[in-house]
């Protein structure tokens, strides 16, 4: 019988080869999935370690160069340092100088050239450089690209800088700001003068304190300007903030990095390169669950597809935001609204209870000195709106609603003084100028164009004079993260009329002694604790102000009932109710408003909470420094 062999057919060979090929391809893909992230991580770690070493380690002959510069007559400039070495030498000079502020980097400075301060040309400076037992200085870097903008965020910045400097005489504050704020060598003094004038931070006028404030001008501020990026704005601003942060820390490495403006995508870079603790004072979330909720998929097929793409983009961005926030060691928020959103967004590497509210400093003491007698006799029917001229402040809505209110009020009360609206704000750039111009044009079409006025770039004393005689203070921003200006209204004795959202609703214009915020003239007292009542026994419980909605203009609206069960009205309707309060009810509401904010939002209250965070950062800085020394890094 013949032997028969089952030889594989060509089809069988193809099946085997295809199976082997697919298996090999799968193995290669699996290997790539493992190796690419691993190699990327190793490369990133090595790159950050090299940068950290170079930016902190001055050249071997740096002390001789400094001594030579100190001994020279006249202004001496140290040349010959490269980009990396200049940053390390600058850091050592700032830490050892009698006048660290002299080493500020402005728009006209060359980063590779360092001029020796005249105050440092003495024996004391050289002794400090050689004295290993001298108290160690620490640099707290405040990242705030718009340090001279004059808004609520800048008030927080300068109050934090003041409290940080007063915490320890061996602390130096470095302000990382846009170089546009520092066009000349004398610009730092101009910026500090503006902080004293605008925010009444009088401690910053002290010459000795100013010596411990160093300004580091950063390039590329236009990269974080939203108008630079009409498309993919959030993503491109995030990338721009990383570039700005790199430019700042490569000029001067701090020991603690504090972000007071809200650029969290810089945190991973700062942490990798500097190995220092990162703290953040969050004014508002870059992206929030409210933003994600505004995307509607119930549209035409084309628009629905675009909405899906936008939603995917935002969700990926939100995950990246969560990742970036995980590098922050200490998180502070400015309001309940912001705190709730940040606890929701920064869930990774953070316990919710570790994200704490630190209410911003609002200068309540200076404004609460206005006498109570002036609140009843010297107040005119003037409505004030203090806000930067930005689109989200919605000045146009206020103007439109005021016109409706003005027409109704003057027809109903022809013998009463006519109301007046005053816009107060800073003009930062050409865009702000254009918005003011358009508002002036819009005001010409009112029932009475003379019933509206504009006060631009006013110093603190001028603003205080306006608040001294005004009756109502308006805030129209939707989901305002906090609303410092609302606190200022209430401290000065004005009745606040605020949008029914965000910080003004949740934290500021809230029940006093358990009474709901009213939206009518009825003042019904409710029981309150004996301790609170004894502290404010002259002020009866009740509402502290009014809330309003903007139907058709608000992205989302809280349509819940007001205190008296009626729907919350528009701004025009709410202004009418506020102006129709009796004299006694008006006086009581002003008194309640002032007392409710006097302690909660004072500079002293902010300072005490900031000191608590300083103690945490102080310990974290010592731990991180210990890690660097263990690795053999220069420090």
UniProtKB/Swiss-Prot annotation:
Signal peptide: none annotated. Gene3D superfamilies: Glycogen Phosphorylase B (3.40.50.2000). InterPro entries: ALG11, ALG11_N, Glyco_trans_1. The lineage of its organism: Eukaryota, Fungi, Dikarya, Ascomycota, Saccharomycotina. One of its GO terms (molecular function) is GDP-Man:Man3GlcNAc2-PP-Dol alpha-1,2-mannosyltransferase activity. Its EC number is 2.4.1.131. It is an enzyme of class 2 (transferase). Pfam families: ALG11_N (PF15924), Glycos_transf_1 (PF00534). GDP-Man:Man(3)GlcNAc(2)-PP-Dol alpha-1,2-mannosyltransferase that operates in the biosynthetic pathway of dolichol-linked oligosaccharides, the glycan precursors employed in protein asparagine (N)-glycosylation. The assembly of dolichol-linked oligosaccharides begins on the cytosolic side of the endoplasmic reticulum membrane and finishes in its lumen. The sequential addition of sugars to dolichol pyrophosphate produces dolichol-linked oligosaccharides containing fourteen sugars, including two GlcNAcs, nine mannoses and three glucoses. The chain crosses the membrane at residues 22-42. Pathway: Protein modification; protein glycosylation. Residues 232-252, 482-502 dip into the membrane without crossing it. GO terms for biological process: dolichol-linked oligosaccharide biosynthetic process. It comes from Yarrowia lipolytica (strain CLIB 122 / E 150). Residues 43-231, 253-481, 503-635 are cytoplasmic. Belongs to the glycosyltransferase group 1 family. Residues 1-21 are lumenal. This is GDP-Man:Man(3)GlcNAc(2)-PP-Dol alpha-1,2-mannosyltransferase. It comes from the Eukaryota.
